[in-house]
Regions:
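Bacterial N-terminal signal peptides
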Residues: 1-10
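Immediate post-signal-peptide N-terminus of mature secreted/exported proteins
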Residues: 14-78, 151-172
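Hydrophobic alpha-helical elements and their junctions with loops/disorder across both membrane
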Residues: 9-12, 54, 87, 114
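Long, amphipathic, charge-rich alpha-helical segments that form helical bundles/coiled-coils
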Residues: 75-145
Length: 173
């Protein structure tokens, strides 16, 4: 025989107070200088994509015959010229003074790495078809730029994201 025991707990008072909806804090709107910086970065990114394409072609053809490798290296030289035109047109808009504090430091690092990359492009244009070391040196500079870009974008995303601790609705008591 089974006995079932029921326990009745007293009803707790229902919370009848109206809770205000909490809206997450709106991140600050970017300034005109910051918009110009991002516009310049967008243009620069087109040039960097050209470099990635050229270096990718060179690395894919390393196991191919010498004529294919030579063709890929010459193509890299041409893409270095195209990339340089995009980078040179976008770089003047990228003024690190558009940002403050740590974001300014990262923006400055990004522009310095971009300038280093830009300085290597004329050599790439002239000698990429003859000297395979050009692709190696360019890959190193491009990796350095990509790391700086990642740090800048990560910091920028964290800066413009609303604080999740402040956006939580109050818990009922």
């Amino acid at each position: 025989m089974t006995a079932i025991t029921m326990v009745v707990l007293p009803l707790q008072a229902q919370d009848t107070t109206a809770h205000r909806d909490t809206v997450p804090a709106v991140p600050p709107a970017p300034s005109i200088e910051q918009l110009q910086y991002m516009d310049g970065l967008k243009t620069v990114t087109r040039g960097v994509a050209q470099l990635h394409d050229g270096l990718s072609r060179v690395s894919r053809t390393q196991q191919a015959d010498s004529a294919t490798r030579h063709h890929a290296a010459k193509r890299l030289g041409g893409l270095c010229g195209t990339a340089r035109s995009f980078i040179v047109s976008g770089r003047p808009k990228m003024k690190p003074s558009a940002y403050s504090d740590s974001l300014r430091i990262l923006a400055k690092q990004l522009t310095l790495r971009l300038d280093t990359l830009t300085n290597a492009l004329p050599i790439c244009e002239r000698t990429a078809g003859r000297d395979p070391a050009v692709a190696t040196a360019l890959t190193t500079k491009l990796k350095s730029y990509d790391d700086a870009l990642l740090a800048f974008k990560t910091s920028q995303a964290a800066f413009y994201r609303p604080d999740s601790a402040k956006a939580q609705p109050p818990t009922p008591q």
